[in-house]
From Swiss-Prot:
Its EC number is 2.7.1.50. The gene is thiM. This is Hydroxyethylthiazole kinase. Its cofactor is Mg(2+). GO terms for molecular function: ATP binding; hydroxyethylthiazole kinase activity; magnesium ion binding. It catalyses: 5-(2-hydroxyethyl)-4-methylthiazole + ATP = 4-methyl-5-(2-phosphooxyethyl)-thiazole + ADP + H(+).
Amino acid sequence: MLTEQIIQSLRAVREQKPLVVNITNYVVMNNTANALLAIGASPIMAHSKQELAEMMSFSGALVINIGTLDSVWTPRMCFAVEQANANNKVVVLDPVGCGASTLRTETSREIARLADKLIIRGNASEIIALAGEQAQSKGVDALDSSDAALGAAQCLVAEYGANVVISGETDYVVTKDSVVTLNNGHPMMPYVTGMGCTLTALTGAFAAVGDESGLAAAAVLGVVGEISAESSRGPGSLQMNLLDELYQLDEETLIQRLKVQ
């Protein structure tokens, strides 16, 4: 049943080509825009408060990534969330580096409190810190294992009514009703900057067509990362191959490679 849901979501993204509004960081804008295009969605990077109400009126979802956060960005992000709420759109929050600084932690929590329909996508240390527990991180990199964040994820589900995607060697999708485990991916993936941010952007595309759990995006990127690594000499070629494999991914390959339970 889970596999069929994932396939249906992939089909819907490619048929509907949803517009995804991204307020994201300077490091990954190109990566995430290309990934959205490759999977079949339509990205737009919208950072001006003057256009956000209009953008959210006709977009499919809002992605907020705090990777290069500053005091100018926070009010825009909060305003965008309010507009997403007004239009009954899902907000996907990537709390990059949450726990590394007070600013990142407090801003992540403020955005999470504001959003009516929320998916949180982060690594284990970010999820643990967002839940108010003691996390182990080095900047934006996680030192905690993904399974160590399961309790924190369940706290976030309860506190914010969110669905939570924990990225790591094993990915977990946590909702109020279930915990789904994904065992795809490749050890080379963390050596490409913005891989988690790419997953967050893809989560926005799938949320726009009805997958408000985050499952389909995590499944697709895990399988694609695994396939891409097989023909990659290192992180540089992996990044390039990833876009090609997102574009080329067919349903039969996804069914054959997917490790979900």
